[in-house]
Amino acid sequence: MDISYIFVICLMALCSGGSSLSQVEGKQKSGRGRGSMWWGIAKVGEPNNITPIMYMDPAIHSTLRRKQRRLVRDNPGVLGALVKGANLAISECQHQFRNRRWNCSTRNFSRGKNLFGKIVDRGCRETSFIYAITSAAVTHSIARACSEGTIESCTCDYSHQSRSPQANHQAGSVAGVRDWEWGGCSDNIGFGFKFSREFVDTGERGRNLREKMNLHNNEAGRAHVQAEMRQECKCHGMSGSCTVKTCWMRLANFRVIGDNLKARFDGATRVQVTNSLRATNALAPVSPNAAGSNSVGSNGLIIPQSGLVYGEEEERMLNDHMPDILLENSHPISKIHHPNMPSPNSLPQAGQRGGRNGRRQGRKHNRYHFQLNPHNPEHKPPGSKDLVYLEPSPSFCEKNLRQGILGTHGRQCNETSLGVDGCGLMCCGRGYRRDEVVVVERCACTFHWCCEVKCKLCRTKKVIYTCL
């Protein structure tokens, strides 16, 4: 009886074919909520008040996975940088979308993966931006914290100072006489990039299209931070002359990264799973020789073949000067040797590890080893800095708490604008109300020695427009 029942079930599954697979994908999309629990650390308190042992606090402990807790424990001081990065991502997201129907609100939502609401359950453009901006903020915050000395396991990036004298001469001047030197304290983008991968991408195994979407957008956020590294210099000489310049690499202001990601949001690429790959429930990895694919180097890092993840300069910086970081299974990965770091020759290589740990390491790096296909076959595949999404965004016009949509009723709009912040688009055609309000502001401020600033209180009338 049992055998016959099993046979009938199997026969029904075979007959249903692709429809069954579509139903499985639908359940995975609409099943348990998406999002990342670690986002909840943004609500645990001020970053400057975070102590290294606070990872054991129940409020923080519940928002982190086991691997994330281990990374926090093994890198003292990193928790404060993570909290700062999470808050940086929220504030930048709200700034970029302050004039949009969806304004990245976190006010009415709980902590953890629901910090941004249930919109993250949908694979839409807004979700892609959330993942990219949070990943970028962690990379930026960790890299800056290393140069500020607040994380015990990392320092400034001294890899540029280890370049050969010939390379410095070529970079310094055409005549071969160097007029500047590497010095100062460069922001440690290598450590920030690698730590962000290990921490942010925890739980994203790349086994289905949604996880691949998350991984791609996380990588895009990190790539934008890395691409905006800039060289800063300081002159040294008598009477203000610039006889010699000392230069270092500095992260750009995070507003620049936010602006770039917002531009990518507007031009995001919709991707899909093809019928030939639907049975695998994910896009198949691209062969190392395929255009736009990656290969895994001997040190376990992803090496792009055609700029899928990094450019040549970024690839050189990450693969040749990877700082020390405590990873899963406590295997540090390093290619640059400092007195307080283990020798690169003594480090186990990813391909040399045997048993379960070796297979796990291989799976971890293979999750970045794919190429997403555009929904429209006439469009080119997304690049390393492009954002990708799976489904169209909702209108965000009407309140729908079930989907995490607050609506635009009561939102202020710009009556003279024809853009997305204009009353026509913001109010979804429902109309708007004109009100005159009296605003009290500080004005006519003067400085009095010493040391006080005195201001007057001025009342001004302003006209505001509010969506019905």
UniProtKB/Swiss-Prot annotation:
Signal peptide positions (record): 1-17
Gene Ontology terms: biological process: anterior/posterior pattern specification, imaginal disc; branch fusion, open tracheal system; branching morphogenesis of an epithelial tube; canonical Wnt signaling pathway; cardioblast differentiation; cell elongation involved in imaginal disc-derived wing morphogenesis; cell fate commitment; chitin-based larval cuticle pattern formation
Disulfide bonds: 93-104, 146-154, 156-185, 233-247, 235-242, 397-428, 413-423, 427-467, 443-458, 445-455, 450-451
GO-annotated molecular function: cytokine activity; extracellular matrix binding; frizzled binding; glycosaminoglycan binding; heparan sulfate proteoglycan binding; morphogen activity; receptor ligand activity
Gene Ontology CC, one term: multivesicular body
Main subcellular localisation: secreted
InterPro entries reported in the protein's UniProt record: Wnt (IPR005817), Wnt_C (IPR043158), Wnt_CS (IPR018161)
Lipid positions (O-palmitoleoyl serine): 239
Effect ascribed to mutating residue 51 to A: No effect on glycosylation
TM ranges: none
Membrane topology: Lipid-anchor
Recorded consequence of changing residue 104 to S: In allele wg-IL114; temperature sensitive lethal
Homology family: Belongs to the Wnt family.
Function as written in the Swiss-Prot or TrEMBL entry: Binds as a ligand to a family of frizzled seven-transmembrane receptors and acts through a cascade of genes on the nucleus. Segment polarity protein. May be a growth factor. Acts on neighboring cells to regulate at least one gene, the homeobox segmentation gene engrailed. Wg signal represses arm phosphorylation. Wg signaling operates by inactivating the sgg repression of engrailed autoactivation. Wg and Wnt2 have a role in the developing trachea and together are responsible for all dorsal trunk formation. Wg also acts in the developing epidermis.
Protein name: Protein wingless
Organism: Drosophila melanogaster
UniProt gene name: wg
